[in-house]
Amino acid sequence: MTVEEELRKLLGENFRDDLVERLSHSVDFGFVPELVWSGIKINIVPDYVVYPRSVEDVVNVVKVALKYKVPIVPYGRGTNRYGNAIPADGGILLDFSKMTNVSIDETNKIAISEPGATWKLVDIYAQQKGLQLRTFPSSYDSTVGGGIASDALGIGSYEYGFISDNTSFVEIVNPKGEIVRLEGKDLALVAGAEGTTGIIVKAGVKLRNFSPTEALTISFESLDQMVKVIGEFYRQVIPAWHVQVRGPYISTYIAERYKAPLSPQKWNMVVLYPSSRSTLVEPKINRIAQEYGGKVFEGEWTGWWSFNHGVAAALRAQGLLIHQHGLIHYTKLMELLNNLEKTLGKLGDLSPDGGFDVDIALEKREVLLVNSFTQISTSPVDKKILYDLAKNTLMMDEYIKVGGSLLSVGIFAHKYAKNRLSSMGKTFSDLGVDRYEVIRKYKEETDPDEIFNPGKLFDPKIRAKGVLEIPRRQQEALTFRFGIGIAKRLSPGGEVEGFKHIRRYLEDFADYSLMCIDCAMCVTVCPQYRLIPQWPYAPKGMFDFVRGAIALYELQGSLDIPDSAIAEISGCHKCGLCDGVCPVRIPISTLLIKLNSLVAKKIPEEPAVELSLFSDQETASVNDPNSQYVLWVGKNLLTNPAVAITALKVLNKMGLKIKVIGTSADSGFMDYISGNGNKFIEKMKKNLNNIENSIEIITLSPEDYRTFSVAYKDYSKLIGSNAYFEVVPLELRVLKSVIFDGNNENINLHIACFSTEYADEIIKRLSEKGFKVRKIEGCSGAVLEKNLGRRADLMAKAIGERYGKIITLCPLAAAKFRSVGIEAITLIEFLAQKLGIQTSQYQVVSFQLDQASKDYIRKELLSDILASLNSQVNIIADTATFSSSGVEEYKKIIEPIVVEVVENIGKSLSSKLASLITQKSSQTSVDKAIIIAEYIKEVSNVLSTIELDKVLQPFMSLLRSKVSEEYDEKVVTNAIVQLLREYTEKLKSIISSNLSGV
């Protein structure tokens, strides 16, 4: 068996090797991807991503990694900035998003946590028991495993020190595949080891009694005053919990932009302390402020801007930041700042390419965590970015010069690992333990093949050697430190090729992804991530995908992003919760709508099918073609037509006569959400003529409700018409009109994506009638399934497993739930049962391709692509030398050749499919048009899922043998891939046209 086969067998759906998962796990808060697309060849893209659910899963994955000598990397939330949690040599990435269990030992005041739980989650559990965290990293949404592995410090470190000071025990899977429990001094083996000595699977986190937190802020005019006050805090041992210092520029910007309670243009010291200590802390603060000329006022700490990631977000909103975390003794602060000022410009004057500012946290052992920021005007995808990244190195050098260290080592500063682990991180040196030596020796003895997180903490000898290029580049930066600006001006700039290439696929989404600071706040609120805790299903993962894609292009010279990958990262239900928490204010949901529309536009439209709805007198008597009241059934009910029959029976019970619009009608919903305006308007005009003079449209699906109530109202004005009708969901009409008793019956009500506008009203009326409603939010995936994404089954199963029997507002969702074995009905059917109406069954005569047919289409399409290209290999070989002119110019040369290739593919595949369609048609009563549509749909699916750069590899090998002169193979590959993608719609059109005459 191969690595892939063993992992798939062990983990099933929790093993992934698709492009989306791999790329979304190749980025963190720092600049590693930028190093890659600046030319340093570090393989940051994992080959496989696994989501363990248990310690047993982790042990099994480790054993596979050891067996095949494949590197393994643990991943929490990717909020670190030193590359700790992303690969340096591909391999297996362990994402702990599905190991998040937390329990509280109240007696010993310990939270027992799995590695994927966030500090915020642990704090919530603790507070429910009257306890809370003693300290946590500045990223509240980072994970327990990540915080311990990096031995972070952050909020509360003034009183409680590093994370290692607040860890009671850790259980790891070591490089022999054994489960080991570490306590006391032995924690030196794992705390700060960055996953190089073992994979954390459980930890005990120390807690304290809960107390409300008070905040006072002291503002000072000068740096000198602030530095003296920092010394006073240590000399007087003021019993605060956390102390944070904001520089003048940071204070001004956050105060003005986010209304934070800070004094603009001043140094602000925010002091946090338990309210129970207010009588001890406040008098001392007031005395210090009076002595050193400070002004005291009430502060606040609960805003997102309170943490370091918040500061980065605030500043990032106006330009790209280069920042560095360092640990120094507090007596070295002035020396550090003076040295940085010589290198970076004026302190407190943060402007593009000039000046810097700092954010400082006090740690209990007289250690300061200094976060220095400088701003640059260069785009992160500019070829000159490497020169600005050198400023990061210069800052690092200044920390080391004053006897300090980086906060973390990661892939960047192996030579300074001892400073970090033994000199500045005093948790273990105070116990007489040389942590650096403990980790180094254990690593050498137990992991000689460098399987565990290679390239981190220590210089690699076997694998991940690309990271060794970083110190060489750092040394160059230090050598030319005063010539960086000159070198930058003289060097050719412009966007890196990888970004230009990826933007062809993702458009504006690619631009905005560069603004993401990887704070992971969007992850915490994302309902789809809560349903399916996998990285691509959270906005952070979606944005990380882009930077990972740019890096992978730069690593391998080509990359094709199939539509299925775009559908996967954009296929959420656009609830907008992420928009509300994003500190950089990226319009995430709007971007995802636009991105999803790029795929939706390409999906072949299904043929109109009119199902018979009037099967008896009861249903037929409801229909009145002259009625001003319309029941819109529409094509969305094709997947669940029994709901339409039941709806007619309900309307009959209510005594209504309505005009019924059947299943062949299309409201234009898919065109509306896809941004296909012209097509939508065309359908809208047709429908408005059909429902002219109507005063009420009764809808059965939330999708049609949204289309008529929002889109028609807006778009009708563009065509000089007005949609005067009222739009009402049938469920709401029934609840308003019919009297019955709920008898305290419990119902799990699924609120479908496009029903949010009326869902609260429905819940209110159900409650008034005596039902106990449990609200279920989360997309079933029924509509997303039409957009090629793989989320649909996962989401439906996740909802069903959590809630059991479901009543949903969406007929499509009900059908989707049932298709994966979940008991589900629509609210319409539920209400019909309460009215004594027998719900209907409807057997739809349909046609679906079996797996063998799908496999055949895929095989023949790939075969035809290669055969058609191979037939043109000689002429393409003759043009290969022109590849030196670049992709865009070379495309112009070979475009006629690729057009001919596309035409040949279309003719060949059409011929093969025509005979199959004729054969299938003779075996079923289904209309041939439906059969043809299924074949065309499957061709479209294959085209939307294949990665053309991989498909082309055999052809490129053949081409190589035909070309005797020098040429740029990357240019040739990318030109052919791009042209094939651009002519995909032409290929579909050729096949559709050829098959229509079958």
Language model features: what each stretch is:
Residues 42, 70, 75-77, 84-91, ...:
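Conserved glycine-rich FAD pyrophosphate-binding loop
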